A protein has these predicted regions:
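Extracellular glycan-modifying ectodomains
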Residues: 1-376, 381-382, 387, 391-395, ...
Length: 401
């Protein structure tokens, strides 16, 4: 009798869900998951025979299930109840940390991209520019004491060694970050490092002693939930703070050749929305020029979203910071060429997608676009940022996902 009641309940639940699904319009975008949802596939004979249609239909039904967010939360709690400490590719860790899982990668893709980095470095050297690459470790590779017991994690040192063997000039920031693992250097709910973590990495790259007391630290918001939490939306994990670090708050900032100009690198309008991390550098813009406060020449940063937080620090040391995001920057380097002849330091700050769709061809294209882009100058330097997770798995997709 009890089994019949349970079965009847679930049948009723499924029927109600199906009815609601028919009445509700499909959602295009999930604010919680920060991604586009699968849409209803078109039926074609070839796709039906190949199985493509059934795969797309399964993704569509999964993404468009009514009350999806609630189901995801319920699924996570059920997995926790049976002792699992990993859900949806996320480790559920001590101290309420959620960390992206990273255990395997394509050695072939890693080798190809290491060779491409070495080629880019050589081409820049021919222009009198030295390039340095930073391989940013994932939270799970730094905060190892918080991981579930026996949770596997890819070996950071082995990955870095491949770059070293390819003669890529690198800065190993793992030691600098690990020395401060008891501090809030990564978000609990997001894959990015915090402003504090980015600061320690910047000091390691500059080879200077960290001194946080020199900086004004302003809490921009205290209700932040990141994209990792969106995969595992546990109500027991509290919201966290996003903090700005600066010595001078107002400075001239120009986006995309003057299309939008403002007086701060912090775009506070995002703090009241669902993408609060976008407060840094106005989310992800193709081209940004920032007035600096320092006397160390001009710096070119080629970056991804990790560079948004990082950029708070070089603007205090350089006269101007020119930022390119190659995920969105599709034009030529004419404007960059005019500026580059004045740059004494060039930074290539990448989230190189060695893992998920990053192709070595992008590095080759970067070299082509920067090659010959200005006069040589003594002491020029480039820095490359490579977060681990998207770095090594090969596959299709955007070059910078």
């Amino acid at each position: 009798m009890r089994n019949k009641i349970i079965t009847s309940f679930f049948c009723l639940l499924l029927a109600v869900s199906a009815l609601v699904g028919l009445l509700m319009p499909d959602r295009y975008y999930s604010e919680r998951e920060k991604r586009t949802l699968a849409q209803k596939p078109k039926l074609a004979v070839a796709d039906f025979i190949s199985g493509k249609f059934s795969d797309e239909l399964e993704k569509y039904l999964t993404d468009q299930v009514p009350l999806r967010d609630g189901w995801v939360t319920m699924k996570t709690y059920m997995e926790l109840a049976i002792g699992k400490r990993e859900s949806g590719g996320v480790y559920i860790c001590k101290d309420k940390y959620l960390m992206d899982k990273f255990t395997s990668y394509s050695k072939k893709q890693l080798a190809a991209n290491a060779a491409a980095l070495a080629d880019l470095q050589e081409k820049l050297a021919a222009e009198g520019v030295s390039m340095n690459t930073i391989l940013v470790p994932m939270a799970a590779q730094v905060l190892t004491d918080k991981l579930p017991a026996y949770a596997p994690v890819a070996d950071y040192a082995a990955i870095l060694q491949v770059l070293t063997d390819a003669d890529v000039d690198t800065t190993d920031v793992l030691s600098a970050l690990a020395a401060h693992s008891s501090e809030s250097i990564y978000y609990r709910t997001n894959h990015h490092w915090t402003s504090l973590g980015a600061y320690y990495a910047y000091c390691a790259w500059r080879d200077v002693q960290a001194n946080a007391d020199e900086w004004t630290q302003e809490v921009l918001c205290d209700d932040f939930y990141g994209t990792t939490w969106n995969k595992v939306p546990l109500p027991s994990v509290p919201a966290e703070e996003i903090t700005a670090w600066y010595k001078r708050i107002n400075r001239s900032v120009s986006y995309n050749n003057g299309q939008y100009e403002t007086d701060s690198i912090y775009e506070r309008k995002y703090l009241s929305g669902n993408d609060q991390y976008a407060v840094f550098l106005n989310s992800n813009q193709a081209q940004t020029v920032i007035e600096g406060s320092g006397k160390s020449g001009k710096l070119l940063l080629i970056k991804d979203s990790y560079g948004n937080t990082f950029s708070q620090f070089p603007v205090e040391d350089y006269a101007e910071v020119h930022v390119l995001d190659l995920r969105f920057f599709k034009g030529g380097c004419g404007g960059v060429r005019q500026r580059k002849r004045h740059h004494r330091c060039i930074g290539a700050l990448w989230r190189a997608e060695f893992c998920e769709g990053y192709k070595s061809a992008l590095l080759t294209e970067t070299a082509r676009r920067l090659r010959g882009a200005g006069q040589k100058a003594d002491g020029q330097r480039a820095v490359g940022f490579l977060p681990i997770l998207p770095t090594l798995r090969g596959g299709k997709g955007k070059l910078f996902a």
